[in-house]
């Protein structure tokens, strides 16, 4: 039994000696595979140039993890314009009533208006989308029935968050319609949270207008039927 164990240990030791080094050198052969140490992945300085196989060498610029994070931590914008089968006044009332957001806005967990005056209100909002929950104050300016503009004033997750809703007349001959313009711009405060941009975009931003439209349907009944050839829906995002 002891003899078998010694043979096994020798075989394992021989395999380890034959493994390629992970110290950053190239292995011989046609594959050209280069093994890097784990700490080398996080180096912000480009590694030393290796000897070219031919007389002409092509060196790709190094890009660190930190550079990638910085490039993704930029302001993102999304805008949408569509014809809605509800009046300007109806859609304005839905958007301006911030205290009801927790009932239908995607991932809104809490919405409390703490101050209100004509054309302005301040609200405490809690928005949760896995794995983050954010509490922030929203400053909301309104112009009935044309505009609702909200901005984040003290969030720890967002460096910038602003939404703008505009309502204008809809189709001629269809009085209970309006043209709705929705725009949102946001930027995460930390490099780590910036990786959540795609989640926030898909789970919250892209569903926003549809959520308010469904709320209008619940409050005011079915929307005005618009002929397909007159329907309009335009989306932009960066």
UniProtKB/Swiss-Prot annotation:
Where does the protein principally reside?
mitochondrion
Superkingdom as given in the UniProt entry:
Eukaryota
State if Protein transport is listed as a keyword: no
Q: Which GO terms describe its biological process?
A: cellular respiration
The annotated topology with respect to the bilayer is: Peripheral membrane protein
What does UniProt give as GO cellular component? mitochondrial inner membrane; mitochondrion
Instruction: Locate the coiled-coil region(s) and give their ranges.
Output: none
**InterPro entries hit by this protein:** COQ10-like, COQ10_START, START-like_dom_sf
Q: What are the subcellular locations of this protein?
A: Mitochondrion inner membrane
Q: Where is the transit peptide?
A: 1-35
Q: Which GO terms describe its molecular function?
A: ubiquinone binding
Keyword annotations for this protein, in alphabetical order, are: Membrane, Mitochondrion, Mitochondrion inner membrane, Transit peptide
SUPFAM superfamilies (UniProt xref)? Bet v1-like (SSF55961)
| Record PANTHER family | COENZYME Q-BINDING PROTEIN COQ10 HOMOLOG B, MITOCHONDRIAL, SPERM PROTEIN HOMOLOG
Assembly and partners are described as: Interacts with coenzyme Q.
Q: What does this protein do?
A: Required for the function of coenzyme Q in the respiratory chain. May serve as a chaperone or may be involved in the transport of Q6 from its site of synthesis to the catalytic sites of the respiratory complexes.
Q: What does the similarity note say?
A: Belongs to the COQ10 family.
| Protein name per UniProt | Coenzyme Q-binding protein COQ10 homolog B, mitochondrial
Q: Which organism is it from?
A: Danio rerio (Zebrafish)
Its encoding gene is what?
A: coq10b
